[in-house]
Amino acid sequence: MKRLRHCLIALALFCSSAQADELMIVRSAQNFEEAMSTLQAAIAAQGYKVTKVQRVDIGLEAKGYKTDRYRVVFYGKPGEVEALAAQYPDLVPYLPLSVAIFAEEGNTILATSRPGLLKQFYPAPALKPVFERWEKDLGAIFDMVRETK
């Protein structure tokens, strides 16, 4: 299980163009259930709504891999995702925002790409403050998860 997790992380890092500064990663001392609950509460505290929780571990297990808990939490501000999708259809692949959360040896890890990086690909002046707010809010969400014991 640990080996599979390390392989998946290595694959994601080596196969994508993502560099370390393009990712936001936080480790929580909470068990998976507590960290998931804290993550959802932190998302709500920033004014967002969880729209979907996708179980990744089921797909991996169906392929024969033994894995611990692994989810992707999708979230967005009510109305904002729809408005942005309507005005900027090419932004749809990045909506709603998401955070991967998985268990690892008694800890829980959260990871996502930095929303502020979207400014490089979507230079519309109206989007810059949106991307910056998303990144600031995500930092607050991750801080809450990291600091909650």
List each language-model region with its residue ranges.
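Terminal, regulation- and interaction-focused segments at domain boundaries
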Residues: 20-51, 143-147
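C-terminal partner/receptor-binding element of secreted or periplasmic proteins
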Residues: 115-149
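Stable alpha-helical elements in mature extracytoplasmic
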Residues: 35, 39, 52, 56, ...
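Bacterial N-terminal signal peptides
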Residues: 7-16
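Beta-strand/loop substructures that line and gate deep hydrophobic ligand-binding cavities in soluble
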Residues: 98-123
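Positively charged n-region of N-terminal signal peptides that target proteins for export
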Residues: 1-6
